[in-house]
Every structure is written in structure tokens, then in C-alpha cells.
Amino acid sequence: MMRRVEDLLKDKIPYGILSNTHGLNGDLKLYLFSNMPELVEKITEAVAYNESQKKFVIVKFSKVRKASDYFIVHLTGIDTISEAEKLKGFIIYLDKSFFPKSKDGEYYFFEILNAEVYDNAGEFIGIVEDIIETGNNDVIVVKKEKEEVLIPVIERYILKIDKEAKKIIVNMPEWLE
């Protein structure tokens, strides 16, 4: 089963989580991981996966409406609160192709996560393990063996991001040399 789940989630991006029920008619609250709420109304079908239960289901969105900081969604065939309860905690995954193509100089986190990072002399530094949003600029967390290096994503330090090759060339910050 694990192999099948991995295959199912290949090329999929976590978009949000079904956190709780809303009302008695099977509606659910969807909190987004993404800063692209405009995509919610375009979703027709998605994969919902709950890692702790090791369960997945293909869901069809029939109604969506905005609430305060979340969306209320109705999924086809989920018409009671007891049916909706079973989907609490499921993460909604969308195909990468569902997202608009990123522009030059911009990137989605999934495009640079696990990218190889090299300095401008071609020396391997590590793999992008995480991305921290600071408000001013992102910071990539690069892991090499047991060491972590934090590199601000600004022109001074990031020389090139090759999203296709999953490769980033950096000018190492002075404090790390």
C-alpha cells in the first residue's frame, strides 16, 4: 500500500487541510497552506490523504465559499456531519500542473525543495530541506550531512535558480566562510 500512496502523491502538492466539519450537511473547513486562494474555486477533483490513518480518497468539490481565514467546502457524496467527520485531518493534494507556471525570478516552494545547492566555484553545499518565510525575503535551509546552512534568498547570495534541474548556485554569505 505504501508504494501505491507514494505513486498517487507523486507530482502532487499539499494545498490545504480539511480541519473540521461545518454545520450538519457535510460541509468541511479547508485551511490553505498556499497563498493562492483564487485556486480553490477552480478545484473540481483532488486527492485527500491522511498520513496517520494511511488512507486516501479522491474527492470532488461541488461548492466552495470563503469564510474568515478558511474556506467552507462541500464534497460530492458527503452529505452528513458523520460522513464529513471521517475526512477531518485529511490533506488536499493538487497536481503540480494545476498551479500557474511561475514567472522568471519567482518560484513555488515545491520547485526548489530538495534542490542541490552549489557555491559559485562549483562546490556542493547541500540540499534545500526547508524554506523559511521571514516577511522581507525567504531563507533556504540547506542541509549537508548533519549541518544546516541558512541562506537568504536575495540577489547578493542567490546567483541562479534552475527550477528544471533543481539546482541553485549561491554566493556564500560572508559569515559562513
Swiss-Prot record:
GO terms for biological process: ribosomal small subunit biogenesis; rRNA processing. Residues 104-176 form the PRC barrel domain. GO terms for molecular function: ribosome binding. It comes from the Bacteria. Gene3D superfamilies: PRC-barrel domain, RimM. It is found in: Cytoplasm. The keyword Mitochondrion does not apply. One of its GO terms (cellular component) is cytoplasm. Keywords: Chaperone, Cytoplasm, Ribosome biogenesis, rRNA processing. Signal peptide: none annotated. InterPro entries: PRC_barrel-like_sf (IPR011033), PRC_RimM (IPR056792), RimM (IPR011961), RimM_N (IPR002676), RimM_N_sf (IPR036976), Transl_B-barrel_sf (IPR009000). Its main location: cytoplasm. Coiled coil: none annotated. NCBIfam families: 16S_RimM (TIGR02273). An accessory protein needed during the final step in the assembly of 30S ribosomal subunit, possibly for assembly of the head region. Essential for efficient processing of 16S rRNA. May be needed both before and after RbfA during the maturation of 16S rRNA. It has affinity for free ribosomal 30S subunits but not for 70S ribosomes. Binds ribosomal protein uS19. Belongs to the RimM family. The PRC barrel domain binds ribosomal protein uS19. This is Ribosome maturation factor RimM. It comes from Fervidobacterium nodosum (strain ATCC 35602 / DSM 5306 / Rt17-B1).
